[in-house]
């Protein structure tokens, strides 16, 4: 978990607590999940559970006035490389799920935003990745405790 604007700013310092500002109801938490694989993998699934006290911000819903930029076909890598490898993220109430039919060897950073809603100390479950047809190939991150004050 990181503060506002993590991936684009180059400073992705992890945070383990957040103080809610009553004057700023739009505070966001940027979550970055890093996946590294030494070899090509098939049928990969990556699941990341969100901590209680937060909600996933679904940017695919057109419910706000945020402006989105169209992709420029003359500059396909302007927003990074490899965005087409993963299928669209599946958003559930308590977790997100990314899938990929083929994942070339390398390092990938998957990001999403959380909206803190309740104060308290909450357990962050480990993110986990596995090959769907080869469950013996799997990995997970570390769990943590996240505090919203």
Segment roles from a protein language model:
Residues 1-149:
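C-terminal segments of large proteins
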């Amino acid at each position: 978990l990181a503060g506002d604007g993590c991936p684009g700013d180059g400073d992705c310092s992890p945070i383990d607590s957040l103080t809610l500002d009553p004057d700023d109801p739009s505070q966001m938490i940027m979550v970055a999940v890093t996946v590294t694989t030494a070899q090509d993998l098939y049928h990969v699934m990556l699941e990341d559970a969100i901590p209680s006290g937060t909600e996933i911000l679904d940017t695919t819903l057109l419910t706000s006035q945020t402006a989105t930029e169209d992709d420029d076909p003359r500059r396909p890598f302007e927003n990074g490389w490899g965005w087409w490898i993963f299928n669209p993220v599946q958003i559930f109430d308590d977790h997100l799920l990314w899938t990929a039919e083929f994942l070339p060897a390398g390092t990938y950073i998957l990001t999403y935003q959380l909206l803190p809603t309740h104060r308290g100390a909450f357990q962050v479950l480990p993110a986990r990745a596995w090959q769907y047809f080869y469950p013996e190939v799997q990995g997970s991150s570390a769990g943590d405790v996240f505090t919203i004050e």
